[in-house]
Amino acid sequence: MNAAIIDTLEKRETTFKKNLKDSNGKVFEIAETTKIGESSIYRLWTKDQSYYYTSKAKKTQICLHFTVGSITGDIATLTKPGNKVSVHYVVDRLGNIYNLIPLNKEKNWSYHLGAKCIGTNGVMSKSAIGIEISNYGPLNKHADGYYNAYKQLYCVEDRHVENILFRNYNYYSRMTEAQKTAVYELVNWLCEQCDIPHNYKLEGMFENDKCAQEFTGIFTHAQVRKDKFDLPYAQVKYIKEMWEESLLPPEPVKKDEPVKTEDITFAEIRKNVEKSTTSIKTMAKKEPTPVKEDKPWYVEILGMITGLFAKIKN
C-alpha cells in the first residue's frame, strides 16, 4: 500500500518554506514578512508577475476557497505565467500565509470564481479578495481508508477527517488548528486593511447577481457556485463565532468582599487601651510566687524514718 498523503504534508510544507520551490521548479523569494497575531504573512516574489492584473479593482469582499491539493502544487497552479487565475493568499496546514498578489484595496486582482459564478466572474473576482486554504476537500470512504478526488489514499485514521454532509459528500479533510487560527487572523486583518465589514454569508446561495455584487463581507466559493464544494458551513462557521465572541464585553472581575468590622468609637478604643495598660501595670506590681526547690529523694526517706523512730520511743 502506498503511503497516505496526510503523512507527507508536513514535510512538503516545511520543505517549501525552506527552499521556496514549487512543483514546477520555480523558486520564489520572500519580499516581505508581516506579523498578524500569532500568524505571519510571507509575500512571495518572482520575476514573472504575469499571473494577475494590476488594473483598478476596489476590494469590498473576501472569498474563501480550498485548493484540493498540497502547497507546492497549489503555488505552482496559482502563479502559472499569463494564466490570470490566482488568489491573494494561500494558507497551509502549518499556518503559514503566502501572499501571491500584492494587497491594494483599489487595484491588483485575478480571476478566481469561474464562469458560472453568481454575480459574474469579472465583477466578483475584482471585488473579492481570494483566500485559498491548502486542503484536499471532499473525501470518499473505502475499506482501507479515505480517498481524495484524484482517487489517492488521503488518510487511514478518522482523526484527519470531518464527518460533514455537504453536496453529496459525507467526509471532508480536517483543517489543522494552526490553519484555522491563521485564516481567522487573516480575515480580520483584511477587514481592517480594506474597510470590509464583518458580514458573513457562509451558507446558502446568493439569490441573484445583484445580491452577490452588492454584498460586502465574507463568503465562500460555494455561495456563488452550486457545483463547488468549498467550503461546508461546518468548516468555516468558527470564523463568525470567534468574531462574535470577541465583541462580547469581558466578564466583570470578582473583587474580594471587604472584611466586616464592628463599628467602634474613638472613646471606646481609648477605654480599651487604658484597660489593657492598667492590667499590665497590676501584673507587674505583684510579687512573684516563690519557686519550690526540689530536694534529693533520700532526704524525704530519712525524714520518714526519723519520724517513725520518734513514735516508737514515745
What is the meaning of each model-derived region?
Residues 1-27, 32, 55-56, 137-284, ...:
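Basic/polar, cationic surfaces and motifs that engage anionic cell-wall
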Residues 290-314:
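Membrane- and interface-active hydrophobic/amphipathic segments that mediate membrane binding, fusion
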Residues 42, 106, 240, 294-295:
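Intrinsically disordered regions, especially transient/low-confidence alpha-helical propensity segments
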Residues 50, 248, 302-303:
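Intrinsically disordered, low-complexity regulatory segments enriched
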Residues 29-192, 196:
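Active-site-adjacent loop/helix surface patches within enzyme catalytic domains
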Residues 78, 239-243, 305:
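Generic structural signal of hydrophobic/aromatic residues within well-ordered alpha-helices
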